């Protein structure tokens, strides 16, 4: 009980401090602050309610006694990850709490296992040792330090123990104080940003030093240099006398005292030192009705040392004429987009009137003695690839606004950055009302200045003495000059006859060739040689869309677009017409059976043919080029013959009951059957043998996937083939015509194709030659036995079942 009473006594003692909100003072001085205005304070009732909710959640998660079973900070961290904080946040009816707020309040303040307060020497040593072991993995580090969370460990190391904060405890010099004040002017109270530019000064140290400076200035204890630096950029007139240490009320900060009252305050302080309730910070008359003047370097700061009343919109004068080309604007004399800013006499005046100015925009340094009159001449002839005479203009075009208007707009935002209201500022009364509302409800005001300059393009254009063109900057409707892109001129212009160096335009012949090139490239069979993708050792007459003539380019010169094309596509200049065997060339010359070099394996790179050998009309050069670019190891898999042979061999070596079709060599059989089936169109193939008569249902299962015209290609199924191979005297299946029994029977070999030249694998067969020989020998044996059996059946009229056979598979 004594401990609890001691804590209560400590809490009951008044806190020693300045008695005023330093952030409010900073804001009143005109500095930008980044306060979390939407933060909700936690009362004792809210804390007790959160404790009970967490205790109930712990019991639901398996802790029988609730929080009493949570002994370590690691267990607390595990518990906090399992609790549904969004559900707990909905239990707070009177205040708006998010799941993040509830979780942060528990883990950062109310957790009984959380250790708060100063770090001991032992904890610092443990932190340094854990950092050497784990690095910046703060969760692992917190596991080695009991009672400290990962956030506490990270903050302690970065702010105090890290190498970047070794000099944080050294004395602040006057130079550092002034540097800190300038950083706060530039960035506001973004302490991490400020500390990144301060040597060995962590963010926490910078914040504490700023608070001390403000406190000393308010109390009159700061030096004249610091006080002047603080007040230099602001519109608040602080008292010269020493300020007392009495707590400053909000009404005192927002006091509307007059200069006469300020003098009375100074006299009263001298005459009556015990006066305690007087204004400490005095604002000049009509503070809220004064419009802040924007400076060049400070950006949109709402205060100035010399306040200026808001002028009526009608009295705002238009900015002076600007005789320069700004970034992104269009030059009226030549329709040339320029990024060159001309030095003018009134540039400083223009920057004063425009917020921010364009001083930081990229500029191009001009040569000495360069006047604005030669801007167009400089732009037309600098970095040019031509030696054409320079264009001189008789007059200088200036850009003067026809009309200008200025608008002041405001946006009122709450603490969370959400827009509440916005509109146009048209009176000082509205400004005063905005300031009062912002102070009353802790709102933010954003002021925007909009200057609208309306320019009129001049109708008269200077005429060039050489070309007589009214618009020298426009070439074929394109506002971009070739001079503005010298690298493009080097790529397209060197050695190309279409680019005329005198006029920097495309002649009609070259323009026609470009149009043809586009149409060829987008056609069904594009002509890739228009882009010089292939070597040019062939006759130039074969390619009508080639850029330029052969006299202007060497044969082995690198391509404009693909310089490495010659190394990828070597020229096959020794090809002749006789090298293409028409018997082996199918409709698609990309087939692996296409022998381009007298039976040798076709090359994967040599793709060009001579002028006399024409490709089949349905094969476009794009398909040939695509095939020739493939590696040699992939090319054999693209042909239909190799894929079919590989699939048939796989089915033959690994049969399955579901495979009911036979894919033998069908090319010759189809030709023979067509000659026979032409006489019997209505006949259907019925498969018979001496062991079993297959009924109509079995025939329907062995038909092909296509319609009846393709049924003559189908043979027996796998089980019939297996039975015929297992018998001592097997009879091969015979196809007979249903209408004409006297027709010549035709033997069908299941799954075994005759080894002919058309179906051979050629040079790509590889390891399949051995299997093909075995299959061919078996096919010849079955063929001879089939002839003997057919002759025996015709003479004897039938035979008995004497051989041992496999039972019929009912499936």
From Swiss-Prot:
Q: Which InterPro entries match?
A: Homeodomain-like_sf, Myb-like_DNA-bd, Myb_dom, SANT/Myb, SANT_dom
Q: Which domain of life is it from?
A: Eukaryota
Q: Where is this region: Disordered?
A: 237-320, 348-379, 535-713, 782-811
Compartments in which it is found? Nucleus
Residue ranges: DNA binding: 138-161, 191-214
Q: Does the keyword Transcription regulation apply?
A: yes
- Write out the GO biological process terms: positive regulation of transcription by RNA polymerase II; regulation of DNA-templated transcription
Q: Which CDD domains match?
A: SANT
Q: What is its main location?
A: nucleus
One GO term in the molecular function aspect is: DNA-binding transcription factor activity, RNA polymerase II-specific
Known role: Activates HIS4 transcription only in combination with PHO2/BAS2. BAS1 is also involved in the regulation of the purine biosynthesis pathway.
The protein's name is: Myb-like DNA-binding protein BAS1
What species was this sequence derived from? Saccharomyces cerevisiae (strain ATCC 204508 / S288c) (Baker's yeast)
